[in-house]
Amino acid sequence: MDKNLEEKVIWLVRHAQAEHNVGPPGNHRRINQVGIKQWEALHNWLVDNPIPIDVIVCSPLRRTLQTMEISFKSYIHKELPVPIKISPLFEESGNWPCDCAMDLSSTEKLFPDYDFSSCYDDIYPLRRGLYGTTYDENYCRAQKPLKHLASLHEKNIVVVTHSVYLRFLLREQRPEDNMNFMPPEKVFRNCEIRKYNLCHTGFQWELIPLIDN
């Protein structure tokens, strides 16, 4: 296997707590006051414990974009800023209103500094096809973002995404699990960051935990 692929490091991050995490699952929920403290805590941790980051890949939903902007501001606003790639492959899995993205024109107005061209694929933000919400559709989609990460030339990659979709990326989600509700002990905490190697098993790409999380 290519040495660069063997050594590719992926840092997975769940977004900060948003309004829907503690209230009704309405549309396009913002980060709440607890979430603001969480993303500041992650930012402070990264200042005290800097990690090498070559690129940040982020889901195009509001809560992930907000989390990325604040938590990683020391990387985004430095003299040579870390590039940011927005990818709909990393959006959430469920069918609650809060898991459905805004129309792209509204998202681009709220976040004008980022390139959303990857979202113009004739499907997104509709929840069908590649972005369908069934277990099988999500299971199939979850292999595509890992292939995408493998194709990037950057070695150290941060991914800012969502709780249930993280379980699909890690092959932990089971058909019998309720995608619209998972007990806290089975998901990443808000603003939790974990370190993985991206490896190919011979059949598919997998994320292997690194012991220095």
UniProtKB/Swiss-Prot annotation:
The positions flagged as active site in the entry are: 15, 92
* GO molecular function terms attached to this record: phosphatase activity
Q: Name one GO cellular component term.
A: cytoplasm
Per the UniProt record, the site (Transition state stabilizer) maps to: 162
Q: Which SMART domains match?
A: PGAM
Which residue spans traverse the membrane? none
InterPro entries for this protein: His_Pase_superF_clade-1 (IPR013078), His_PPase_superfam (IPR029033), PGM_Phosphatase (IPR050275)
Which terms are listed as keywords in the entry?
Answer: Hydrolase
- EC numbers on record: 3.1.3.-
Q: Which Gene3D superfamilies match?
A: Phosphoglycerate mutase-like (3.40.50.1240)
Q: Taxonomically, which superkingdom?
A: Eukaryota
Q: Which family does it belong to?
A: Belongs to the phosphoglycerate mutase family. BPG-dependent PGAM subfamily.
Name the record gives this protein: Probable phosphatase SPBPB21E7.02c
Organism the protein comes from:
Schizosaccharomyces pombe (strain 972 / ATCC 24843) (Fission yeast)
Give the classification, highest ranks: Eukaryota, Fungi, Dikarya, Ascomycota, Taphrinomycotina
